[in-house]
């Protein structure tokens, strides 16, 4: 009996999978391909599917991590002998574990060093030690932006967040980015404060941000979708332009049977399926990509050269290489194509 029940459950599962597979609008790639096909079909034209160019991947970690300058050994030895809390901070750094600090722990160390050295400076009376402390604090403050960069864009977890191996951003989903967006906003405020040399900030949440980056891959999915949608909208726009150049859809602005079919597809597929996905991408860009772009831009002074080209492609909102600027241009051009097509028949929305 259990075998029969298992067989029925398996059959039901297969039916569900088959039905899902028959719905081209359940995922971004088949949805956009189907859309281009239907545009061609209703306009009696054969669409040409352009190749989606390979995305520029995030530079390898070794090309993102900046070398962290160290204090002179003599200065560290001197400070480690002085009887205030700073000797313990220096001692931890000189330990075996301290020599292989991960970027976030290194940032915590740098902040703690500056704070502790400042506290020591208020209590010390020896002029020589005062001079050493002031020099150490100045050096650490100067190199703090490097530690901040390494703890944001120099971590392995960033590669998972931006991986392209997880396909496109899902269709018809809600609230996928709330945690990532909240993290990005909080991280930006903290980094901005640190760059202003305000060290009275909480770094305790930072590790959780990295954990979420390691578990999520939404930024990479969004970039995949932006590239896919821009290319496929361009394909559909070319079909429209070809029809407009070859022969009118309507004569004397009067609708006909074909224009009714075109209008029906416009509302059912473009307005009903594609536009909601475009709205999802715009929201996701605002919620996640824009704060991440800000996180990189505010650290432009230390941004590695290898990272800059990738930033211009994946995170920048403007520029020839920006996937987001290209998406905006594709949407604008496609909208104008629909307007020109429907206007021939007096069917332009809002007219």
Please state what every model-predicted region is.
Residues 2-11:
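Bacterial N-terminal signal peptides that target proteins for export
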């Amino acid at each position: 009996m259990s075998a029969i029940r298992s067989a029925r459950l398996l059959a039901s599962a297969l039916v569900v999978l088959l039905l899902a597979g028959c719905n081209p609008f359940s995922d971004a790639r088949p949805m956009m391909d189907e859309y281009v096909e239907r545009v061609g079909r209703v306009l009696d034209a054969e669409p040409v599917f352009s190749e989606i160019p390979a995305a520029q991947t995030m530079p390898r970690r070794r090309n993102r991590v900046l070398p962290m300058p160290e204090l002179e050994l003599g200065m560290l030895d001197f400070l480690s002998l002085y009887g205030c809390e700073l000797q313990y901070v220096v001692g931890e750094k000189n330990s075996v574990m301290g020599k292989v600090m991960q970027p976030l722990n290194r940032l915590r160390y740098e902040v703690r060093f500056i704070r502790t050295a400042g506290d020591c400076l208020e209590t010390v009376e020896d002029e020589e030690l005062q001079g050493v402390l002031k020099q150490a604090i100045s050096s650490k403050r100067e190199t703090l932006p490097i530690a901040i960069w390494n703890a944001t864009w120099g971590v392995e977890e960033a590669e998972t967040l931006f991986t392209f191996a997880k396909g496109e951003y899902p269709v018809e989903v809600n609230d996928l980015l709330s945690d990532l967006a909240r993290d990005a906003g909080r991280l930006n405020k903290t980094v901005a404060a640190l760059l202003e040399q305000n060290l009275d900030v909480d770094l305790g949440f930072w590790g959780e941000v990295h954990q979420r980056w390691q578990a999520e891959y939404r930024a990479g999915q969004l970039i995949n979708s932006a590239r896919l949608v821009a290319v496929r909208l361009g394909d559909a726009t070319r079909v429209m332009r070809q029809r407009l150049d070859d022969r009118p859809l309507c004569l004397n602005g009067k609708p006909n049977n074909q224009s009714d079919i075109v209008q029906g597809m416009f509302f059912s597929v473009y307005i009903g399926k594609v536009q909601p996905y475009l709205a999802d991408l715009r929201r996701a860009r605002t919620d996640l990509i824009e704060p991440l772009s800000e996180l990189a831009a505010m650290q432009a002074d230390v941004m590695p050269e290898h990272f800059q080209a990738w930033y211009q492609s994946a995170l920048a909102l403007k520029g020839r290489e920006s996937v987001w600027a290209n998406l905006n241009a594709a949407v604008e051009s496609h909208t104008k194509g629909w307007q020109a097509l429907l206007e021939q028949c007096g069917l332009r929305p809002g007219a």
